[in-house]
Amino acid sequence: MLFRSDILKDASATAIYGSRGANGVILVTTKKGKEGKVTLNYSGTVTFETLHDVTEMMSAAEWLDYARLAKYNAGSYASATPTYEADKAAFGSVTASWKNIEKAWVNGVYDPSLVGSYDWASHGKQTGITHEHTLSASGGSDKFQGYASFGYLDQKGTQPGQAYERYTLKTSFDVTPVNWFKMGSSINASYSTQDYGYSFSKSVTGSGDFYSALRSMIPWTVPYDENGEYVRYPSGDVNIINPIRELDYNTNQRRTFRASASLYSQIDFGKIWKPLEGLSYRLQFGPEFQFYTLGVANAADGINGDGNNGAQYKNEQKRAWTLDNLIYYNKALGQHNLGMTLMQSASAYHYEMGDMRATNVASSDELWYNIGSAGTLNSFGTGLTETQMASYMIRLNYSYKDKYLLTASMRWDGASQLAEGHKWASFPSAAIAWRMDQEDFLKDISWLNQLKLRIGMGVTGNAAIKAYATKGAITGLYYNWGQNESSLGYVPSDPSQKEPAKMANPTLGWERTTQYNVGVDYGFFNNRLTGSIDAYKTKTDDLLLEMSIPSLTGYVSTYANVGKTSGYGIDLQVNAIPIQTKDFSWSTTLTWSMDRNRIDELSNGRTEDVNNKWFVGEEIGVYYDWVYDGIWKTEEAEEAAKYGRKPGQIKVKDLNNDDTIDANDDKKIVGHTRPRWTGGWSNTFSYKNFELSFFILSRWGFTVPQGAVTLDGRYMQRKIDYWVAGTNENAKYYSPGSNGEGADAFNSAMNYQDGSYIKVRNISLGYNFTPQQLKNLGINNLKLYVQAMNPFNIYKACDFLDTDLVNYDNNTKTFGSPTTLKSFVIGVNIGF
């Protein structure tokens, strides 16, 4: 139902939305009915999706070489070279798995090519098939226009046990019963069911999804013995549990119903009484609802069940609404045009939840529908969150000859989640524009179609913290009295808990960002070359972030206005039609953007906050650690010893050259979460009825916090270049087992990878049938197309991750992915 979306980047435009414009504004225009005969449209796609490995794992023989070295260095493998006896002692505790190693020992000689292996990962992926169908109808008269669509999506995931099904209903109508009044609505509703698949929680190896757990199994191990019996610990390690049967013992289902609406009515007073011409009133109301349930059942025979049937049932309800009252006044006085908008807005958000988790449920076949039969109720709880916001705004517009444009606004927002006395803030904005192409001295330039200069300033606010975050929460704590007696008490916080309460902040207020921008919109050569150039500068005061604090306070974090930041950026867009003939055309769009930010001031006059990785003069979102400088070589043994190191271990830089490595003086910023720049290039080629398009995306100069490994010879390992004395001393990674069964002391120094990439996001080929081809079928238009999604990378700096799967903002980060998804789509659009 999406018709188009517009991104507002101008400071004045985003400031109109106050706190809601803090992260930019995207205006979404949905499809509506049009005056005329009723039209019927169908669109359908079938998508084939496959899961591909990006990270290459060790083979069975490679893993054995690595594990032997790790165990030898740690003192638990008896020989510097492989022997049957040492292998038997180290890897022979499970007979069924040991046979894959034993077959490589022929007449007392080890042949790595004969090591047997089992393809665990093949059980964890499949071709995902999705089919989606949408049927829509629209039409109307001069007094009524309507639109309705129904959609259905069915998806089989790329991993067994994953599935998703969704129904959608969308309607909109606009009614004009008399020329001075109109009303309308847009309503969206959806219901979905998701089989989430298995999520491990018991074993070290099993953490994560089903496929990842299978890939984490050591390749020479087997899931079943020669009698077909399940092997729980294939390598003999109690932390590496065989996950192959888990889909039979676990259910994880989520159901969601969503509904939202946008309702309006508008009165044009000028059409009722001529002296009020230009005055109108609009009432808008937008309710939203969401009902969500989560059901999890773990059978006793599975890993998560671990001997007891377990169940969880959680439900959530979210309700929100926004009510806007708007008064518009527009007046033309000769070549002068004046406009004024007054707005009063109120919004509210309500969230409630209930969650129960239990073990010793009577039967896993009853899923989560009989938790009352549980022998142990592990946890139960309910919760309520409510927030409100009130807003007022005045905006003035002025234009002269449609060449000189001025906009000014003031908005006031009040947010309930902020502290008393700090809930309200004002957000002014102003902008001017000059349509230079309308000037007499430029009108006669034939190749100039548009040239517009824009200058703006605006203030936006951010109050995005959890409700009640300014108030101190209390935490339940059981006190023991002797051996058999305890009582429940409450304390402000317990830092030892998994999620301790945050310290109250009774002065928490708005984060305010002031932005200045200048931009140019242009169009040349009959608009065959168009685009825009925007530059902006920002300054943020009272930055609103979660801040770590010393646990000796009784807390570990609090929300705080921590300081000031500044930033700047450039956005470029170029649209061109280089070729346009009768049968062939080529259109292309190139976008490029960069932004920088800097911490100018921290609270309490500090210049750095190492715990939060905040440093005055540096960006928000940095990585601060040791600086990797290679691996100590054998001939460097004497030098390494000065630092308490030995050959085969990680070398880090002694930044202050004091012959000591310490955290206070030898760490520095080693990476940034945000890319130095982002670019995109889209192209569409049309030849007669055929259409070919592709899109390329690039993000450059950002850091992915992945790569550090624990080389203890215990768990499955990706293929790496590790240090071996005398034979591979120029390796990137340290010698396995060089720190016993633990990771190297400076292992984190290897945890930062360049995430830069250039990727082809999609390629599409379509055919549009002509009216002459369709005239005997009763069809107005027909398009068939195929599309490849995520087909390949042109370049990527990190060879073991898909770094396109990285999200970032000022305060959070996620990791790249060891797998990537590729899709092939077949689609059809039909109009009647």
Enumerate the language-model features and the residues they cover.
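Conserved small-residue
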Residues: N41-D111, D355, A469, G476, ...
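Extracellular/periplasmic, surface-exposed regions of secreted and cell-surface proteins
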Residues: H131, R166, S172-Y191, G197-K202, ...
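Surface-exposed, extracytoplasmic segments of Gram-negative outer-membrane nutrient-acquisition systems
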Residues: A104-D111, P492-A501, Y536-V562, T589, ...
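Short Gly/aromatic-enriched secondary-structure transition segments
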Residues: E56-M58, N298-A300, M356-T359, G605, ...
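Short Pro/Gly-enriched beta-strand edge/turn motifs at strand-loop
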Residues: S113-W120, N378, D662-D665
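Asp/Glu-centered strand-loop micro-motifs enriched in Gly/Pro and often flanked by an aromatic residue
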Residues: W120-K125, R245-N252, G381-T382, D665-G671
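Short, charged/polar, Gly/Pro-enriched secondary-structure boundary elements
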Residues: K32-L40, G206-F210, A463
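Short, small/polar-rich motifs associated with maturation and membrane association
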Residues: M1-K170, V178, K182-G184, N188-S190, ...
